[in-house]
Amino acid sequence: MPSDLAKKKAAKKKEAAKARQRPRKGHEENGDVVTEPQVAEKNEANGRETTEVDLLTKELEDFEMKKAAARAVTGVLASHPNSTDVHIINLSLTFHGQELLSDTKLELNSGRRYGLIGLNGIGKSMLLSAIGKREVPIPEHIDIYHLTREMPPSDKTPLHCVMEVDTERAMLEKEAERLAHEDAECEKLMELYERLEELDADKAEMRASRILHGLGFTPAMQRKKLKDFSGGWRMRVALARALFIRPFMLLLDEPTNHLDLDACVWLEEELKTFKRILVLVSHSQDFLNGVCTNIIHMHNKKLKYYTGNYDQYVKTRLELEENQMKRFHWEQDQIAHMKNYIARFGHGSAKLARQAQSKEKTLQKMMASGLTERVVSDKTLSFYFPPCGKIPPPVIMVQNVSFKYTKDGPCIYNNLEFGIDLDTRVALVGPNGAGKSTLLKLLTGELLPTDGMIRKHSHVKIGRYHQHLQEQLDLDLSPLEYMMKCYPEIKEKEEMRKIIGRYGLTGKQQVSPIRNLSDGQKCRVCLAWLAWQNPHMLFLDEPTNHLDIETIDALADAINEFEGGMMLVSHDFRLIQQVAQEIWVCEKQTITKWPGDILAYKEHLKSKLVDEEPQLTKRTHNV
């Protein structure tokens, strides 16, 4: 029988459950009370929107099913079925008949955080999908959560979307409310409450709110409808769900895409505490360094394992490859020497012939035991921005500029005053919504100032790379056809092939329809197109999304060799460190120059997280 204290506790929780079930006359929406008649008026429109969302969701699911059908995976579980470690041998993976992995091993150990790296198009995302859909033999007791796409737009709030993902907790709470409403036996109710306590049910909303806050959602945003957010923000909600559920195996594919630097720093600190199995694909060396305990290199149809973060991987791999090449050259020298000796003395005197036979046996043993292979290096890229010529300063002058999107809307910038020229190398940083992309649009003329003036040199050409540039590509054309169409002055196809080849698109990729290319390859088409605009100023808004690490390094080298000016918006700390000479912070309707480098700014963001934590805990207690 339960104690008196337990009975009182159960009675209290029962009353709270009943209170939650009482109908309300209205609910809060963006700070305003919305009554039931107002809700009813929206039903017809919402019904239409829901139908469209359902159709889009079904299309995405069908697409994923087609991809899965074109994928073939084989492998054998080598670890104990009850183990929390996963060891799979003889792993092979093919997609549309193309072999991505061949007779390799997958080793994922509990408590380790793995960074999965490799060139664009090599099959990293395909491998994550195969693991997430259990196409490899992973024991059932290991639950897997694979973050695949953004949340579809709906009337749900981000907070609700995050909390509903914990299905066991939601089911237990629903059952507890039902029993409380029916005035059921106290013992059964107590069992449910005990299980909910184990799942931190009382703290679930606080934890969900903390995660959303870390990813940039203010308290008001957490209660807005999902359909009012852009795709990037809905992707953050999907990421928050993945973090909230705490699966035993968490699979993240480019989790920092669509995040600002503040959210990247928070996510890095959050993932550092993940104690189960984490596998993430990321193009950010800085992020991989901060999070990962191990690196998996997908290369030459094999998975190769390295202990340590990304920097340690680079060091270890270089040492191993140097030793491998030394061994390779030594073996080749030995083989050449023995073959030469056998050819010269194999038919000589008896003594020399015996020595030749001995060397032939040694050679056969070497060949039978397996020779060291030559190191196959990743293909190196060499991006190129053509010379733009000189124009005298000032190239762009910003004079007392203020901007707001609507007459009654909030002011994004107030009285900006600065100039930029061909020597400018600036990274714009600051939280989402502070106006970084807005500033680039103002400077290009895509947006006009509400007040003030922006003066540009009459001959200046500006090239702006942004996240939606891919949408402007003609997907039915090949990269070669698209570039020939955009730049008809280049008559020879071979010349254009060389141009495109510098951006990592070679052979069949140049003549395949753009729709068949990976996101990273489409980005390269956009970069090639941008470069041959021959701009004086490069405005780069998140250029690293979908690019691999080697491509980002090639882009950084090209920017550093570029004769013109550059303004960059990026969540990649390492790229900023490589190319930016100044850091400008966009915040509170103005722009201020940061006194240090980007690494000092990152430490500043970390210290802000520490300062905000007590305030956040206090605020979420009052939710």
Curated annotation (Swiss-Prot):
List ligand-binding residues for ATP 1.
G118, L119, N120, G121, I122, G123, K124, S125
What Pfam families does the database record attribute to this sequence?
ABC_tran, ABC_tran_Xtn
Query: Where Phosphothreonine occurs, residue numbers?
Result: T218
Listed CDD domains: ABCF_EF-3 (cd03221)
Note whether Repeat occurs among the keywords.
Answer: yes
Q: Which SUPFAM superfamilies does this one have? A: P-loop containing nucleoside triphosphate hydrolases
Keywords in alphabetical order, please: Acetylation, ATP-binding, Nucleotide-binding, Phosphoprotein, Repeat
For the ligand (ATP 2), the binding residues are: G430, P431, N432, G433, A434, G435, K436, S437
Highest taxon of the source? Answer: Eukaryota
The answer to whether the entry has keyword Phosphoprotein is: yes
Regarding protein family, the annotation reads: Belongs to the ABC transporter superfamily. ABCF family. EF3 subfamily.
Q: Which PANTHER family match?
A: ATP-BINDING CASSETTE SUB-FAMILY F MEMBER 2, ATP-BINDING TRANSPORT PROTEIN-RELATED
User: What is the protein's given name?
Assistant: ATP-binding cassette sub-family F member 2
Q: Name the species this protein comes from.
A: Homo sapiens
List the lineage, top down: Eukaryota, Metazoa, Chordata, Craniata, Vertebrata
Gene expressing this chain = ABCF2
